[in-house]
Design a protein with these regions (language model features):
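Short coil/linker segments at helix-helix boundaries
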Residues: 393-400, 455-511, 516, 533-536
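C-terminal "exit" segments of structured domains
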Residues: 271-414, 420-423, 427-434
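Von Willebrand factor
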Residues: 104-169, 176-222, 227-231, 253-260
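Acidic, polar low-complexity linker/tail segments
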Residues: 34-112, 118-126
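Short solvent-exposed coil/turn linkers within tandem alpha-helical repeat scaffolds
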Residues: 209, 228-229, 428-437, 509-522, ...
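VWA/integrin I-like adhesion module and closely mimicked acidic/polar interface patches used
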Residues: 225-310
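Bacterial signal peptide processing site
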Residues: 18-20
């Protein structure tokens, strides 16, 4: 629905500005050109001596495996260097063969497949069934890896949507029975996904069987979403550790900093929840939701390269993996922009418990401010502001200026709700040591300052014209407000805000090259952060 909101905003902006104003998009000449990939990727840093790792650092380093298990593809950067997030579901099912082999080599193993039965997961589910059929047919024909007897691997299948359904409830070692049930999952049209409740039920049901039979327990979650109840993840991790289970997930990458991508949902819901909940990749979003002046609809989505936080955190806390998959026809991730794995491995999400995450926020005002700013609603861009004012009649000119100023007045509180906490927390910026948090805070403040400078500057420049401004050429009768790299005429306060935006955005480009944060900083800088009057 965001594209509808953006369209309505453009219509509202055109209202109430009087006959003295002519409309055009003053930002149109700054529309971004298609960017080519840089000729070279950043030089690889020299390996540092291995430090003594904390438990948190060990967990995060383990998480980075999420990109190492992915296949080839083309990145925006690196001249087509192969990157991940391009493996098929079937390929990721096949990758689990190695995990199964390692497990049954250690001890007899029970594997429980937890499969998303919702409508949006139809392609994922079909691809999983194809991959699993190939896997189990091979087990049936050629035996288990390492020559292990068939009873060393038992299988159960569970599906979930709004409710949980046990497709193969009693674990079976009959591979033919498993093959026969792969396509037996019924589609759930509710759009609801009780993912973590189902995982908890599986632990409760199969944990005791694991103990009774002396088996290892592997759980594989196959889903295209994050789960409506993903916030249960900390309690589920505790239950997983007490059960002694290794969790894997096969799914799509999370949209960076977003609960859902700006694509048409494949299903609908009536309970107020997003139709498709697929992110973010961090526990909470660390990306402010501000539209770009220079961007089109749906142009802000980025493939994070990581799975949604809850499932990824669960998988790696149990020594499993989240296997990122790309689907052939699903709208997400589709052709969304993605970045080189070698770069993104340096920016893993913070895999912390809820308590640990909140402690980090309480210790640093900049992080707390980022958290607050990223939780605000979307701030629309001032895409088509009035820019040309004909001076024919003072009363009509005043009406036109009043109407134009109402646009800025409407946006101002939304912008301040993002900018003000970030500016207040700036004093703690240099205390941030995590690279992802550094880049996220800098981008948030840089973008918020840029938007504030443009909107407040626009309002102030209109106020200056309203107060009276003489033409240098007496034959001229029109003032045109054009984008410029200055706000000196609007006042020192706004010029300071403009310079603050420029400083933060340029720092991101310098310190975090070839990353999504640098890309968004470049995109923000494509439009000048300021205004000037030109007479005609």
């Amino acid at each position: 629905m965001r594209w509808i909101s953006a369209t309505l905003m453009g219509v509202v902006m055109l209202a109430g500005c009087g006959e003295n104003v002519k409309f055009r998009n003053p930002l149109a000449k700054n529309q971004p050109k298609q960017q080519a990939a840089p000729a070279q990727t950043a030089a690889k840093p020299k390996a540092d001596p291995k430090p003594v790792q904390t438990k948190e650092a060990q967990a995060r380093n383990t998480m980075i495996r999420t990109t190492s298990l992915r296949g080839g593809g083309a990145s925006r950067f690196g001249n087509g260097k192969t990157v991940g997030a391009n493996s098929s579901v079937e390929e990721n099912v096949e990758r689990l063969r190695t995990e199964i082999a390692g497990s049954i080599d250690f001890a007899p193993t029970m594997i429980v497949w937890i499969v998303d039965s919702t409508l949006s997961a139809s392609e994922l589910r079909s691809s999983w069934a194809n991959g699993a059929k190939k896997l189990y047919t091979d087990f049936q024909t050629n035996g288990l890896p390492g020559g292990k007897p068939a009873d060393n691997l038992s299988t159960a299948i569970v599906s979930f949507g709004e409710k949980t359904d046990f497709v193969i409830e009693q674990p079976t070692t009959n591979f033919g029975e498993v093959i026969g049930k792969l396509a037996a999952i019924q589609t759930d049209n509710s759009g609801k996904e009780s993912t973590f409740a189902t995982i908890g039920q599986v632990f409760d049901k199969y944990g005791p069987i694991k103990q009774q039979q002396g088996r290892e327990l592997m759980v594989v979650v196959v889903t295209d979403e994050a789960g409506d109840d993903w916030k249960q993840v900390d309690s589920i991790v505790e239950k997983a550790n007490s059960t002694g289970v290794r969790v894997y997930a096969i799914g799509v990458p999370a949209p960076m900093g977003r609960m859902m991508a700006e694509v048409a949902p494949q299903e609908s819901r009536s309970d107020g929840m997003p139709a498709m909940l697929q992110g973010p990749e961090t526990r909470y979003s660390q990306r402010v939701d501000m539209k770009f002046n220079s961007g089109g609809f749906g142009g802000d989505d980025v493939d994070s390269g990581y799975g949604p936080f809850g499932l990824t955190y669960l998988a790696y806390q149990t020594r499993g993996s989240f296997l990122v998959s790309r689907l052939r026809s699903a709208p997400w991730p589709g052709s969304a922009m993605r970045f080189d794995d070698e770069v993104m491995r340096k920016y893993p999400p913070q895999y912390l418990t809820e308590a640990q995450y909140q402690a980090k926020l309480s210790e640093n005002k900049a992080l707390a401010a980022l958290h607050q700013a990223a939780s605000q609603g979307q701030v629309e861009a001032m895409t088509y502001p009035a820019s040309q004012f004909v001076v024919e009649d003072e009363a009509r000119l005043k009406n036109a200026l009043d109407g134009a100023q109402r646009i800025a007045a409407r946006l101002e509180p939304m912008i301040n709700a993002v900018y003000d906490p970030l500016a207040e927390g700036e004093k703690d910026r240099d205390k941030i040591t995590d690279k992802r948090w550094q880049a996220s805070y800098d981008l948030a403040l840089g973008r918020a300052a840029a938007v504030k400078a443009r909107v407040d500057g626009y309002n102030q420049m209109l106020a200056i014209l309203k107060g009276g401004r003489k033409f240098e050429d007496p034959s001229h009768d029109t003032w045109n407000l054009e984008p410029a790299d200055t706000l000196e005429e609007a006042g020192s306060r706004l010029e300071k805000t403009r310079l603050q935006a420029k400083e933060y955005l340029e720092r991101i480009i310098k310190e975090h090259p070839d990353t999504p944060w640098a890309y968004f900083a470049e995109k923000e800088l494509e439009t000048p952060i300021g205004w000037k009057w030109v007479e005609y």
